[in-house]
From Swiss-Prot:
Transmembrane segments: none annotated. It is found in: Cell inner membrane. It comes from Escherichia coli (strain K12). ATP binds at G150, G151, A152, G153, V154, G155, K156, T157. Its main location: membrane. This is ATP synthase subunit beta. Its EC number is 7.1.2.2. Produces ATP from ADP in the presence of a proton gradient across the membrane. The catalytic sites are hosted primarily by the beta subunits. Belongs to the ATPase alpha/beta chains family. F-type ATPases have 2 components, CF(1) - the catalytic core - and CF(0) - the membrane proton channel. CF(1) has five subunits: alpha(3), beta(3), gamma(1), delta(1), epsilon(1). CF(0) has three main subunits: a(1), b(2) and c(9-12). The alpha and beta chains form an alternating ring which encloses part of the gamma chain. CF(1) is attached to CF(0) by a central stalk formed by the gamma and epsilon chains, while a peripheral stalk is formed by the delta and b chains. NCBIfam families: atpD. CDD domains: ATP-synt_F1_beta_C, ATP-synt_F1_beta_N, F1-ATPase_beta_CD. The gene is atpD. It is a peripheral membrane protein.
Length: 460
């Protein structure tokens, strides 16, 4: 085991000098004793002359030149398997929930090759989420990849928590949650939410939160993914939740300049597409088992063309776009039904009825969008009878796309609703065909199934 010395410390980036004949490989883990703390460094570059450039997986406060550094001769390894269920771990797989050792039987390196092309499998099976707008407009595939896109404060985390609650309770498999650069409070809420709904023993939690150094945030997604891969390779259907994939990119941006790379567009790292690809190519389903992943993607300044969200789009099967405009109308979940897409929305996969209903809803909403300008200038009276009907139905559909969430009961005061796909299709089809033209539009706001809207109308 070779030993080197620290020669330079700049923030999270540490340069270490080793003997010329014992230089560590790229991605090898190094260990340094920083006071009472054990700090792990990960090799990023070999600079020549026996010097390697590393990223610290923890705070580099108190590090100084001349400290001894040990080469562990392998990449960062984390515990995998059933021992991780119900536990909260950090980027190195160390427990942070004060419940003692993990007691794992096996450790895996966080850097692994993606499955080969022959091993990949393609599933057309749908995953019902119980959220009307998602099941109808952008259905999820079992073993598929879903992105929740949205700016600050439009409900990415709440939507993600509702999905976890619905899927983890309805779906009996294992889940892995990777909190990448998000708020510690949300991590805490999430843990208690899981404990209260008795699913904590089926979830492994890995956190690298906002207050942690960029090294932790850059690698914690890989830690969570490695745990999910182990469950998949045991032949299970596993769910992987990542909140938030943008912070993974951002952590790379933070260390990119310190690593001596030239920034590219908008100041992102030049290796943005490659780093995203390395992560996304591993989140995949094989012939042995599947990984269904839901990833929250922060959209800087609500600009979907920003390089970071734009790079993520290419890897996904379904995109759920949350819109500030819809949130400002008080419609939650604030999913934009015209902007959200799914590869599964195909008559061969979802069936003709579902496909026609979804496309019908889109065309009514699209027409309403076009008529809005006319209404704003001339008022409703100038519209033709046909257009007035379209507007009335569109406003009902818009309100019917809202739904009370289980995880938001505390804020809304109304009990959460799980709506089956069958009921969702029936409800929207009925509105489009004019069965509910006589009901006031308020009746459709924040209800579950169409029967509830009819009941609500009686009380109005």
């Amino acid at each position: 085991m070779a030993t080197g010395k620290i020669v330079q410390v700049i923030g999270a980036v540490v340069d270490v000098e080793f003997p010329q004949d014992a230089v560590p490989r790229v991605y090898d883990a190094l260990e340094v004793q920083n006071g009472n703390e054990r700090l792990v460094l990960e090799v990023q570059q070999q600079l020549g002359g026996g010097i390697v450039r590393t990223i610290a997986m923890g705070s580099s406060d108190g590090l100084r030149r001349g400290l001894d550094v040990k080469d562990l001769e392998h990449p960062i390894e984390v515990p995998v398997g059933k021992a991780t269920l119900g536990r909260i771990m950090n980027v190195l797989g160390e427990p942070v929930d004060m419940k003692g050792e993990i007691g794992e039987e096996e450790r895996w390196a966080i850097h692994r090759a993606a499955p080969s092309y022959e091993e990949l499998s393609n599933s057309q099976e749908l995953l019902e989420t119980g959220i009307k707008v998602i099941d109808l407009m952008c259905p999820f595939a079992k073993g598929g990849k879903v992105g929740l896109f949205g700016g600050a404060g439009v409900g990415k985390t709440v939507n993600m928590m509702e999905l976890i609650r619905n899927i983890a309770i309805e779906h009996s498999g294992y889940s892995v949650f990777a909190g990448v650069g998000e708020r510690t409070r949300e991590g805490n809420d999430f843990y208690h939410e899981m404990t209260d709904s008795n699913v904590i023993d089926k979830v492994s939690l890995v956190y690298g939160q906002m207050n942690e150094p960029p090294g932790n945030r850059l690698r914690v997604a890989l830690t969570g993914l490695t745990m999910a891969e182990k469950f998949r390779d045991e032949g299970r259907d596993v769910l992987l939740f990542v909140d938030n994939i943008y912070r993974y990119t951002l952590a790379g941006t933070e260390v990119s300049a310190l690593l001596g790379r030239m920034p590219s567009a908008v100041g992102y790292q030049p290796t943005l597409a490659e780093e995203m690809g390395v992560l996304q190519e591993r989140i995949t389903s094989t012939k042995t088992g599947s990984i269904t992943s839901v990833q929250a993607v922060y959209v800087p300044a609500d600009d979907l063309t920003d390089p970071s969200p734009a790079t993520t789009f290419a890897h996904l099967d379904a995109t759920v776009v949350l819109s500030r405009q819809i949130a400002s109308l008080g419609i939650y979940p604030a999913v934009d039904p015209l902007d959200s897409t799914s590869r599964q929305l195909d008559p061969l996969v979802v069936g003709q009825e579902h496909y026609d209903t979804a496309r019908g809803v889109q065309s009514i909403l699209q027409r309403y969008q076009e008529l809005k300008d006319i209404i704003a200038i001339l008022g409703m009276d100038e519209l033709s009878e046909e257009d007035k009907l379209v507007v009335a139905r569109a406003r009902k559909i818009q309100r019917f796309l809202s739904q009370p969430f289980f995880v938001a009961e505390v804020f809304t005061g109304s009990p959460g609703k799980y709506v089956s796909l069958k009921d969702t299709i029936r409800g929207f089809k009925g509105i489009m065909e004019g069965e509910y033209d006589h009901l006031p539009e308020q009746a459709f706001y924040m209800v579950g199934s169409i029967e509830e809207a009819v009941e609500k109308a009686k009380k109005l």
